[in-house]
Every structure is written in structure tokens, then in C-alpha cells.
Amino acid sequence: MRDYDEVTAFLGEWGPFQRLIFFLLSASIIPNGFNGMSIVFLAGTPEHRCLVPHTVNLSSAWRNHSIPLETKDGRQVPQKCRRYRLATIANFSELGLEPGRDVDLEQLEQESCLDGWEYDKDVFLSTIVTEWDLVCKDDWKAPLTTSLFFVGVLMGSFISGQLSDRFGRKNVLFLTMGMQTGFSFLQVFSVNFEMFTVLFVLVGMGQISNYVAAFVLGTEILSKSIRIIFATLGVCIFYAFGFMVLPLFAYFIRDWRMLLLALTVPGVLCGALWWFIPESPRWLISQGRIKEAEVIIRKAAKINGIVAPSTIFDPSELQDLNSTKPQLHHIYDLIRTRNIRVITIMSIILWLTISVGYFGLSLDTPNLHGDIYVNCFLLAAVEVPAYVLAWLLLQYLPRRYSISAALFLGGSVLLFMQLVPSELFYLSTALVMVGKFGITSAYSMVYVYTAELYPTVVRNMGVGVSSTASRLGSILSPYFVYLGAYDRFLPYILMGSLTILTAILTLFFPESFGVPLPDTIDQMLRVKGIKQWQIQSQTRMQKDGEESPTVLKSTAF
């Protein structure tokens, strides 16, 4: 009995067909990069202060002193959410009294921004913040928008796999690509914050579903050696490229509606890939559509300049994976023994912390010193060497040491930021870049590591639960950034501390480097780095009469 890889081995590893699929599927991820992070510019909060209407009769002196001052980073700056009571200062102005000389400003009554705000337009012409006044008492709405986008990502991650299993990888890929682009287009016509946010949730659902479908399609079409590079480098680097393109669009288009409209164009262009990307032959075979799968393989052979055998898929020889009797496993198996329970809990913590760090630093771009467009580009560009380093580390070094070192690097530089003098803001920005580099490397490696830790029978569930924890981390990340409004260093202190603690925790994971993938939960206990012993205890009073499980005792460093 031959499996799919053996049957299609005549196509070769890296011919023109494989290169075409590799680059086209990777290119389909580019819109994901800028759609996911576009909120950095769509919801940018410019400098603002209370609006003082021109209809109010104030002298120039009183108009210049109509906003109270506050101390921020050692400087006196106008308050953003308060002004002196206009009726009072208008009366003083009419009487000819001068602010500061005749009137003690500290004793004046204040009021909220009853007439709205005026916004600085040096960086943004308009954002959803300036359009719907998402500042002061409503400043929580901007991070909520981002969190709800990631809620959409979480929802999409639940349904994308089921949809692609039922309707095909290619159909779901282009359907969700259209969903992402279409709802982004509809956001342009949002009439209020609520409409924008609901549509953004749907964009998030389409974004992750598109990503998952492209990922699965590539891993099923490409050969064993190439699919590893595709999974660790291809989709990741093209995602980073999309992220790098975002500030270029935003620099030249500073109105949020026009920016959104421009960002939908690449998604529309990706629709042309329908005529070049085939359906997964593996999926077609699983559906009994062998003739269609054979047509695709023969076309691939023609592109590669190879003569295909007269019969490619012989139903009597092809190993049908669906014919094997499925074993029933449920989520309880992830906590059935002490060993797998400890690994599951630690994996959840690891994924959640990495996600908070990755998305927190990406979304924190507006709070960095310097040009927001340059900083955004650098935060995206630093991901490329991070992915390359992660791939090299996965090839040659133990997993837990590599991930722990990357996290320790990212966390330590974030903690060090609070010690940097305010005048050395370039150093602070450089430290954020290094932190993003370390956390991104860990993010890339943790996918492979988690899949290697879990046995075949529960691998999808294990990775799925961990990935869900990652989505929860991304939902929380905007509020880590939001804390920067109270203390500039607080987000970095929290993210840095969590990252370093997780780096230490990672050292207690079992090592999977160079070890065959476990197939059963019992085999999982024999992964290199775990010392085992059998708990000797009284016979359990259970109906199924199971033996006491082998548990995690210690980890050899």
C-alpha cells in the first residue's frame, strides 16, 4: 500500500509547479499582514485638546489659556479632557482681566469638553478616533475595536478547519479572502463606531480562515521537505511583507476611509489567483474524486516537464487514510495523565504570553518615540530575520533552549527600557525592536514545538487548545497597550515580566529535538528529557480498572 507522497514522488521536490504553488499561496497571505495591523493607523489617536468655539467672545490671551496644564514626562502640556469653564473666563475676558496676572488660573472651575475636541493633523488627517471622538471617557472604545477583531479571529479559527474539510481548501481560501476584502470595503461606509466594529469582527473571521486554508493547502500539495519551509518561512515572511507595506500605504493616504479603500485593492487582485491555484489533490481523494485529483497531478507533471505514469492513483493500491478505523479521543485526554496535563497547562501559558507580547508590541507603534510610519515599518521588517533565525534554530538546536533564549532576550530588553533616559529615545525604540525580534522568533518556533510534544491521537486538539490561548492573548493585548496612557513604561514592564517568567517555565518542558513524534499518550511520556517512574499505589476504585498514569517527575537541563 502506498501513501500519497509515494504516489506523487515522481513530480520531484522543487520543480516549477512547486515553486508556483509556494509563492502564490504565500502571496495570498500579504493582505492578511496589513489588514491585521491596519488598526494601528485606522484608530490612531492624535494629539488633542478641548475645542473652544470661535463663537465664544474671548481675548487672545484668554483663548491661549483656556486649557489647564498638566505635568507629563517632566513637561507642562495642555490637558486633553478638561478646559476652564467658558462662561467664567468669557466674563473675565469681557471685564479686561488678564489670566495669570489678575486671575489665579489654579482656582478656576473646570469642565469637560462639552463642544468636542480639536485634533492635531500633522500625523493623521482623520481616523475613527477623530471621526467619532473616541477619546477621554470613550477612549476605551479604540482598544475594544482591536480586541473584537481578534474575537473574530478566534471565531474564524474554530470554523475554518471544518469549512475547508467539507467544502475544499481552495473554495474556502477564496471565499474567506473575499470575505476579508469585502467587509473591509464595507467598513469604508461605516456611519458609526458600532457598524465599523461589527464589520471588523467579520474581517477578523475572514482573515484567519484565509490564512488557515492557504496553510493547509500548501502543506498538502507541497512535498515533505518543502512544506516545512513553507510553514515556517513562506507564509510568515509574506505576512511580514504585508505588514511592511502597511506604513507605506498609510504614509501617503492619511484619511482612514481612503486608506481602507486602498488596502482592499491587493485583496481584489488576489482573486486572479483562482485560475492558478488548484484544489488539494489529497482532499479530492478523501472525497472520492480521484479523477479530478489525477487531472491536477498530470497538469503539475506537465509544468515540471515530467512524463506522468499512465495510472497515477490506483484505488486498489492507494492507501486511503479515511479507511482506517478512527479512534475516539476527546479534549479530556489533554488532562488525563499528570504529564500531559502539565504540558497542556504550560503550553497554554506559553502561547498566551507570546501572543500578548507579539501583538502588544505591534499595536504599541503609536506610543514609540519617532516617526510612526518608520517605526511600524521597522517593527514589521524585524520579523523577517526573526523567522529566518527561528528556522535555523529549529534545524540545529534543542527546542526548549531556543524558545527560552528568544523569550529571555525579548523580555529582558523590555524590562531594561524603564532605565533608559527619556532623551535617549532612539535607544528605547531599538530595544522595542530587539524585543519584537525575540518574541517573534519564539512565536514561529512554538508552532512546531507544540506539534512535536503532543501524540498523534490528540495532536490537533493539543495545538488547537494552545492556539485558542494565543487568540485570547491577542484579545488582551490592546489593553496592555492601553495601560500606557497611565504610565509610559507599564506595558513594557508587564510584557517583559511575563515573557521572562515564561522563558523560565519553558525550560521545564520535555525536549523533542531529534525524537520521533509520539503516536500515543503513553509514548508521550518517553520523550527525551523526562524522567519517569510508575506511581505505586493502591488499586484504584474505578470501573475501567486503569493503571496509575506515569507522571512528569523532573526535567533534565
From Swiss-Prot:
Report activity regulation: Inhibited by emetine, quinidine and verapamil. The IC(50) of emetine is 4.2 uM. Not inhibited by valproic acid. Transport of (R)-carnitine is stimulated by cholesterol in the plasma membrane.
A GO-annotated cellular component: brush border membrane
For this UniProt entry, what is the primary localization, expressed as one broad class? membrane
> A single Gene Ontology molecular function, please?
ATP binding
> Would I find Lipid biosynthesis among this entry's keywords?
no
Family matches, as InterPro entries: MFS_dom, MFS_sugar_transport-like, MFS_trans_sf, Orgcat_transp/SVOP, S22A4/5, Sugar_transporter_CS
Q: Which residues are glycosylated?
A: 57, 64, 91
Top-level taxon of the source organism? Eukaryota
- Mapped to this chain, the residue ranges on the Cytoplasmic side of the membrane are 1-20, 164-172, 219-232, 279-341, 395-406, 452-462, 510-557
Induction behaviour = Intestinal expression is induced by IFNG.
Q: Which residues carry this modification: Phosphothreonine?
A: 550
Enumerate the Gene Ontology biological process terms.
Answer: (R)-carnitine transmembrane transport; (R)-carnitine transport; adult heart development; carnitine metabolic process; carnitine transmembrane transport; carnitine transport; establishment of localization in cell; locomotory behavior
Distribution of this protein across tissues and organs: Widely expressed. Expressed in kidney, liver and testis. Expressed at the brush border of the small, large intestine and colon (at protein level).
Q: What residues bear Phosphoserine in this entry?
A: 548
Q: Which residues bind ATP?
A: 218-225
The protein's matches in Gene3D superfamilies, at most eight in alphabetical order, are given as: MFS general substrate transporter like domains
* TM regions (residue ranges): 21-41, 143-163, 173-193, 198-218, 233-253, 258-278, 342-362, 374-394, 407-427, 431-451, 463-483, 489-509
The UniProt keywords, alphabetically, are:
ATP-binding, Cell membrane, Disease variant, Glycoprotein, Ion transport, Membrane, Nucleotide-binding, Phosphoprotein, Sodium, Sodium transport, Symport, Transmembrane, Transmembrane helix, Transport
The disorder on record is: Defects in Slc22a5 are the cause of the juvenile visceral steatosis (JVS) phenotype. JVS is an autosomal recessive animal model of systemic carnitine deficiency.
- Role, per record: Sodium-ion dependent, high affinity carnitine transporter. Involved in the active cellular uptake of carnitine. Transports one sodium ion with one molecule of carnitine. Also transports organic cations such as tetraethylammonium (TEA) without the involvement of sodium. Also relative uptake activity ratio of carnitine to TEA is 11.3. May also contribute to regulate the transport of organic compounds in testis across the blood-testis-barrier.
The name under which this protein is listed is Organic cation/carnitine transporter 2
